[in-house]
């Protein structure tokens, strides 16, 4: 049982507010939550917070805060599951979850909340059940066109019409407008991996972790059977390695409840009959052992003179992806000592950009080709830079420098090596139009840290 539900923007502006029981302090509770959230040290706030006799449970999704409050002694895990399900429902019915989308569909969001929760008690979170009661149509920013090549693919990757669907096609509502009789039968399947890496100052690998998901968004009628074929060398745990090759191994794996595993052990095929909307077909994790080299290596060189306050940092970034692959939206973030007053730079290509901001150096590289190597020479004046005793140049890093962190996106690449071999649909619509199938693979950084 929950007392209130509200959605805040990243700046704390209330977008949605619903009081189910009338036992709270009104809209001031949303402001109280954001003050407590921003008053906490660090970037990671706890998902459960308390104030007097009230509990706040929240998740962050697409830059929004989805918050539930209760004064009862309820398991926080059940409320976190409810918030996650609400985020999925909003994405299903509005097309995507974001500040602009919520603002355009306020009436639809309130109608969903009225059907999902009655006096704070959950009635249903099923997309299929709710579609019988929801009357408000979603408001989208523009009509969706599958072959609108002015759009770009997932995470900004350039796409080809015959291979990848524009990103807008996957972000439309699962329920078409009642005036739109041309609802397309489509399935979008994404293999998404988040890479966490920690590299020591001597270049040795201290930690590596891959968190992966196979995400499905289906516009087919509910219960339509589909089969997803994974890489045949895919195995779970070291004891399950098969054949003579290194195999594609993960440490842990979990499946959605709608997945049938009768063909998984023998042929690595997932069979399922999903409902309309979004779901995570499979989650997996891999630690310590990657089948391929890390996507990036950084080779830093530091020279600083305490007497003159001159700091020189030379960074060489090597991309170890295959030559036909590329990384997009690469950004290197390097914390700097306090008091930097000037920056001069020499970059290896004109597309790069570097600037100072919030006590750090930001080096942006829009596109990095696999097998390439880029460099940047940065000279800064730091008066009164603290450090070990002595004058003259030093090759040791001064206090406050580093560690460096990288953010990037790798379209059509998975760090674990897992690939979808095929996506087969048993559904056959009336007429000659076959369902459209879109499969995408991508990896992106989660925490890619290199010590200086």
Curated annotation (Swiss-Prot):
GO terms under cellular component: AP-4 adaptor complex; clathrin adaptor complex; cytoplasmic vesicle; cytosol; early endosome; trans-Golgi network
Recorded coiled-coil stretches: none
Protease keyword on record: no
Cleavable signal peptide: none
UniProt keyword terms in alphabetical order: Endosome, Golgi apparatus, Membrane, Protein transport, Transport
Membrane-related topology note: Peripheral membrane protein
Pfam family, one: Clat_adaptor_s
Ranges where the MHD domain occurs: 184-451
Major localisation: Golgi
Lineage top rank: taxon: Eukaryota
CDD domains: AP-4_Mu4_Cterm (cd09253), AP4_Mu_N (cd14838)
Localization of this protein: Golgi apparatus, trans-Golgi network membrane; Early endosome
GO biological process, one term: protein targeting
SUPFAM superfamilies documented for this protein: Second domain of Mu2 adaptin subunit (ap50) of ap2 adaptor, SNARE-like
Family: Belongs to the adaptor complexes medium subunit family.
PANTHER family named in the record: AP COMPLEX SUBUNIT MU (PTHR10529)
Oligomeric and partner information: Adaptor protein complex 4 (AP-4) is a heterotetramer composed of two large adaptins (epsilon-type subunit AP4E1 and beta-type subunit AP4B1), a medium adaptin (mu-type subunit AP4M1) and a small adaptin (sigma-type AP4S1). Interacts with tyrosine-based sorting signals on the cytoplasmic tail of cargo proteins such as APP, ATG9A, LAMP2 and NAGPA. Interacts with the C-terminal domain of GRID2. Interacts with GRIA1 and GRIA2; the interaction is indirect via CACNG3.
Main function: Component of the adaptor protein complex 4 (AP-4). Adaptor protein complexes are vesicle coat components involved both in vesicle formation and cargo selection. They control the vesicular transport of proteins in different trafficking pathways. AP-4 forms a non clathrin-associated coat on vesicles departing the trans-Golgi network (TGN) and may be involved in the targeting of proteins from the trans-Golgi network (TGN) to the endosomal-lysosomal system.
Record protein name field: AP-4 complex subunit mu-1
């Amino acid at each position: 049982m929950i007392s209130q539900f509200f959605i805040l923007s990243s700046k704390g502006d209330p977008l949605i507010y619903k009081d189910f029981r009338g036992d709270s302090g009104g809209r001031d509770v949303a402001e109280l939550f954001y003050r407590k959230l921003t008053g906490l040290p660090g970037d990671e706030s706890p998902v459960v917070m308390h104030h007097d006799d009230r509990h706040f449970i929240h998740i962050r999704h697409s830059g929004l805060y989805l918050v539930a409050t209760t004064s009862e002694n309820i398991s926080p895990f059940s409320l976190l599951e409810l918030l996650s399900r609400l985020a999925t429902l909003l994405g299903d019915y509005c097309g995507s979850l974001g500040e602009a989308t919520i603002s355009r569909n306020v009436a639809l969001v309130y109608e969903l909340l009225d059907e999902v929760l009655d006096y704070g008690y959950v009635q249903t979170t099923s997309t299929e059940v709710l579609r019988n009661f929801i009357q408000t149509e979603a408001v989208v920013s523009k009509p969706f066109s599958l072959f609108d090549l002015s759009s770009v693919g997932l995470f900004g990757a350039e796409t080809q019409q015959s291979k990848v669907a524009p990103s807008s096609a996957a972000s439309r509502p699962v329920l078409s407008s009642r005036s739109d009789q041309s609802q397309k039968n489509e399935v979008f399947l994404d293999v998404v991996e988040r890479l966490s890496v920690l590299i020591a100052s001597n270049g040795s690998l201290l930690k590596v972790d891959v968190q992966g998901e196979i995400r499905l968004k289906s516009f087919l009628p509910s219960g339509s059977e589909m089969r997803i074929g994974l890489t045949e060398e895919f195995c779970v745990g070291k004891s399950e390695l098969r054949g003579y090759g290194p195999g594609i191994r993960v440490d842990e794996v979990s499946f959605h409840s709608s997945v049938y595993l009768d063909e998984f052990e023998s042929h690595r095929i997932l069979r399922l009959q999903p409902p309309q909307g979004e779901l995570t077909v499979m989650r997996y994790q891999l630690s310590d052992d990657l089948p391929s080299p890390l996507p990036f290596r950084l080779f830093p060189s530091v020279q600083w003179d305490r007497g003159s306050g001159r700091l020189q940092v030379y960074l060489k970034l090597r991309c170890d992806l295959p030559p036909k692959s590329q990384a997009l939206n690469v950004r290197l973030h390097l914390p700097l000592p306090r008091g930097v007053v000037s920056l001069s730079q020499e970059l290896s290509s004109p597309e790069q950009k570097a600037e100072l901001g919030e006590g750090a150096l930001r080096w942006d590289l829009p596109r990095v080709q696999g097998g390439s190597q880029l460099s940047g020479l940065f000279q800064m004046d730091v008066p009164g830079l603290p450090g070990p005793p002595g004058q003259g140049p030093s090759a040791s890093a001064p206090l406050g420098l580093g560690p460096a962190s990288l953010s990037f996106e790798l379209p059509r690449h998975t760090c674990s090596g897992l690939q979808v071999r095929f996506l087969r649909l048993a559904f056959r619509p009336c007429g000659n139009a076959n369902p459209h199938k879109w499969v995408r693979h991508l990896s992106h950084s989660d925490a890619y840290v290199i010590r200086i």
